Every structure is written in structure tokens, then in C-alpha cells.
């Protein structure tokens, strides 16, 4: 039996789901692969709860329960720089399931010293290209869950490239939030009402502009482009926002109060698309020539036009899949499916460490 020490950075929605899945399926993974994951640390911006010889199930569940009521993971000053300064007892895996920036250097240092990294956090891979190179050098980082949650998007793309296929174009709708809004708009709901409902249901970020800016889709597009070998920097992909610049500078309360200003323009765009027999979708297109991220009117028979709600769809046009692109489709958001994508990467990484 091979024991793999892990430190998990992030104990929010995805982090909690991942911990629950690991605790629930740990015995099955041990029986199937001869691998046992051992939590030596749980970390977030409030600190680090750690034990070099491994946290007990009781300690893990207590930490999560305390976090749920607003307590920090560790007292001020405990463990110095938290997970960044913690030394694993042997070669192990650092898991980043946060949405925080600024982790790329520390994670790359772990890769350089022989540890592995598994990411659901997009920001380390969508920073400077040099950071992407440092993280992914020698296969030191797996990142399936950064694009498409638990869908096999990154692995499909890598398999196509590894087999010698040549990519022509990726076309994708990869925001569950924006997909939901498009569906609601097509049903006749004003954008203001759709955004408020999505916000109430927790589909959006606390500030919906984080979704409506398109920045999250641009990060995913950049990760896909870099996976294809394109050495792009963040500024090479610009996203079309759903709101004018003037609404980007106001407070959240004012933004929510002024959402009705967007109703008429969006109703007109939806009506125009429907009159043409098409559908309005927020689409990312990636090729060697460049990328575009924004709202597009698609023909009614386009695969992306059939999407409903928060589902994602990724279409890969390649030399081998030229006439009928290879399509990956399914839920592209949700704590459980995202955690499952992280867990699959963890198992694959652990099997490599065991070999």
C-alpha cells in the first residue's frame, strides 16, 4: 500500500465536496489501486490545519465544521506562511481548489522539488506564460477541473495532440452561468430578472460582474490555447462584457439596482437572433490565428445553439475530425462534478507516484 501525503488549499464549496468524496471513497481506491491518500494539511487564507503524520478523520471533519461557522483554520501566526512553508514528509500532492491569485510561484516551486500539483483554480495557469510552463513542466501539474468542471475536456484535448492529430479550431460555450442567462433570455425573461435570480440561486459569483465580464471564460480559453502549445499571454484574449464600462466602476448595490438599463439592449439582441432562426450564445473560439470570446448569434442547427441552462459544450475540429468535430458536452459547473474532476486527477497522479 502506497500512502500519498496531500495538502488541500481551499475548503469552500469544491474543497468540501472533494474532502467528502475522498473520505467516502478512500477504502475503495486503496483496494483498487493500492493507494491511500493522507491529508497532512488543510489550508486557506485563514491559515493551515496540519499534522505531518496525517490528520485524522475527526480532525478533518472538525476543521470543516469550524470553517462552516466562520472560524479560521489556524490561529494568527501559526505555521508561518501556511502551506507555502509546510514541508511534506515525502513526495506528495498539493491541491488548489481556491479561486485565489498569486499561488503560481509557490506551486511551481513544489513541482520543481518533485512534488505534484492538481488544480481546479484557473488563475495559476492563466497568469504569465512562464508560470504555466513552470507548473506544467514534466507533467508536474494536472488541471482537468480548470475547464469544464468534471468533463473530460483537457484530457480529450491532450489525447488528440498526443496521438499526432492537428487542431484546427476549438469552439466552446464554457460558462454555466452565462449559459443559464442565455436560456432565460430566450424564454422571454428580462436580463435584470435573470441575473437577480441567478444571483439568488448562487449560480453567479457574489458580484455577478465577475461572471458577466467574461474574464472567467477568457481564462479557460487561455488554458486551452496553452494546452495546444500556443505561448499566449493573458492580454492576447479579450472578452466581451455584458455591461458597459460605466457599470464596472460602481458599487455592487448600484450595479444591481441599475440592471434594468441592460434589459432593452439584450431583448433586442435576442429578438434579432430568434427572427433569424438562430440563438444568442456566449462563445469562445480558439485557433492558431487567435481567439475571440463574446456573444454570437448562431444558426439554429449549430451544436452550441441546442444548449440549455448551465450545460457546457466543447467542439474540437482537427485534421481527423474535420467533417464532424469531436464534441464533449455536459454539466460544466457544480461543486460535486468539479470535485470529481479533481479526484480523477488525484488518482492518476498518485498512480504515477506509485509506479
Could you describe each region identified by the protein language model?
Residues 1-112:
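N-terminal glycine-/serine-/threonine-rich beta1-alpha1-beta2 phosphate-ribose binding loop
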Residues 19-23, 126, 133, 154-158, ...:
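Predominant activation on well-ordered alpha-helical scaffold segments within soluble catalytic domains
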Residues 9, 13, 17, 37, ...:
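Conserved active-site and cofactor/substrate-binding residues in soluble primary-metabolism enzymes
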Residues 100-113, 120-160:
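Rossmann-fold NAD(P)-binding glycine/threonine-rich loop
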Residues 93-96, 119-120, 141-145, 169-172, ...:
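General beta-strand structural signal in soluble alpha/beta enzymes
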Residues 169-174, 179, 197, 204, ...:
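Catalytic, metal-anchored helix/loop core of enzyme active sites in primary metabolism
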Residues 184-185, 195-306:
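Substrate-binding/catalytic subdomain of NAD(P)-dependent oxidoreductase enzymes
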Residues 136-201, 215, 222-223:
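Rossmann-like NAD(P)H-binding beta-loop-alpha module
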